[in-house]
Design a protein with these regions (language model features):
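Catalytic pocket-lining loop regions of alpha/beta-barrel enzymes
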Residues: 1-102
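Short Gly/Pro-enriched loop/turn and capping motifs at secondary-structure junctions
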Residues: 67-69, 107-110
Length: 152
């Protein structure tokens, strides 16, 4: 069973960032090589560290949930977040293994159609089916079994 670990910024002033940094997942991944770990939120804002931890450890994947919040207009989102999205794109390419990357929304904090649109502009189109569906079904194998039962 995979273990998803919250990484990245915390919503609470009393939360300690050292415990939500993606490098903490490296320690767990090395100690438990038979467990699959998912770095939630791609370690935002520490994309480089999250990508390196996933690159180094065969048992670590990344989800792209909760990277933006709210309901901005698409062009406004691209304009305001251009540097952020460019950085995310750079580090996903550094990882170079789109089989380790999954879509995630962090709903209800985001507008789902807008979020899908944003992620589709960061992930190369040839990997969309894997990132938006196949990887989650493979990594969270119980989901695939449930979908089969439902005919999906």
């Amino acid at each position: 069973m995979p273990i998803a670990i919250h990484t990245g910024d915390t919503a609470w002033p009393s939360g300690l960032l050292k415990y939500s940094h993606p490098l903490t997942v490296d320690e767990a991944a090395v100690a438990f090589p038979d467990v699959t770990f998912v770095i939630a939120h791609c370690g935002c804002p520490w994309f480089a560290d999250a990508a390196e931890v996933a690159c180094k450890n065969a048992n670590v994947c990344i989800d792209l949930s909760g990277l933006v919040e709210g309901n901005p207009k698409p062009l406004m989102l691209l304009e305001r977040q251009r540097g952020f999205l460019r950085q995310l794109h750079t580090w996903l390419n550094y990882l170079g293994n789109y089989e380790k990357i999954m879509y995630g929304s962090d709903w209800p904090l985001v507008n789902i159609p807008l979020y899908i649109w944003m992620i589709s502009h960061v992930v190369p189109e040839c990997y969309h089916e894997d990132v938006f569906y196949n990887n989650a079904v493979r990594i969270y194998s119980k989901i695939g079994k449930l979908l089969e039962k439902c005919g999906g």
